[in-house]
Amino acid sequence: MKQCILKAASVTLPLVLRTKGKQHLSILIYHRVLPKYDFMRPSEPTIKEFDWHMSLVSRCFTPLSLARALELMDRGELPENAICVTFDDGYADNESCALPILKKWNIPATVFVATGFINGGRMWNDTVVETIKCAGEYIDLRKVGLDEYTFNDSQSKRIVAQKILTKIKHREVEHRAEAVDFIESLAEQLLPNDLMATDQQILNLEAAGVEIGGHTVNHPILAKLNDRHAQQEIVDGKKHLETIIGKKLRYFAYPNGKLGDDYLESQVRIVKEAGFEAAVSTTWGVSARNSDRFQLARFTPWDKRSGKFLLRLLLNQKSVKL
């Protein structure tokens, strides 16, 4: 029955929304594709889940590279239900887990890499998550302006980790770093140092046709930085990646990606002046010919059921939220 419903939906929903899907571009955001389910990261798809995501994208949409999509959008020639797949941050599993599936379904992609964490580094949020994951029954973080936390099960650890991330995400860079360093000092085992891509994995992605894009060096909240510091983050990350892949970077993704909260209009100008051709945000919706090329909308598909995943993607063409 489930397969019948899915088949019917995959045929009828694109037809129903066809007029709305013309000249609209959906851009999907992913971060990781996991070898197996991680209770601390329930929203990150496993290999199996990502495979059916891409199956539906391939069968029900028109997947395009970001470059091709923007070219067609400029000419007013976007195909119906055009879609792009992007990844943020530069995780190793983009190459080891996602790339084989992208190849299987012949789906282009763009990976935006924060260069400060590649080759054995670890993003600050992963340090928090991994520390809480291996914690015992109690942790005291009052020293860095947080609380005492008690853990009963895996769900309580996940909830606490999310609370901590929310509380420290928008702290000044140095204050956030101090909190993360303290949290890491309480880790009860060595934390993984292989979460992020290596230079070779970035080269493997690029050689396979994946577009590599800029995502700053240290993934800061750009809105917290002055323009000089923001420019340094944006430009240095771009130059580092250009050195690795031996070609010019064309696209940029704002860390966290909400205008006002995470980046400012002045930093949009910096991205333009740095030589990027376009940039993506995390504002939900679709992009069209008249959209700001340096603040393109993106969309996160998190559904675990194929029917609702498909429906959400299709309704995003109308910017309808479920």
Please report, for each region that a protein language model flagged, where it lies by residue:
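Conserved radical SAM core fold
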Residues: R32-L34, I118, G214-I221
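Extended, charge-rich helix/loop segments that form flexible
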Residues: K20, G121-A208
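Short beta-alpha junction loops
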Residues: T115-N119, G285
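Generic enzyme active-site microenvironment
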Residues: T86-F87, G213
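C-terminal active-site subregion of NodB/CE4 polysaccharide deacetylases
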Residues: M1-T86, D93, W124-K133, D140-L141, ...
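CE4/NodB-like, metal-dependent polysaccharide N-deacetylase domain
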Residues: L28, L78-P79, Y91, L99-F112, ...
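Generic beta-sheet signal
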Residues: F112-A114, H215, T282
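Residues within well-ordered alpha-helices
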Residues: H53, A98, T198-Q201, Q267
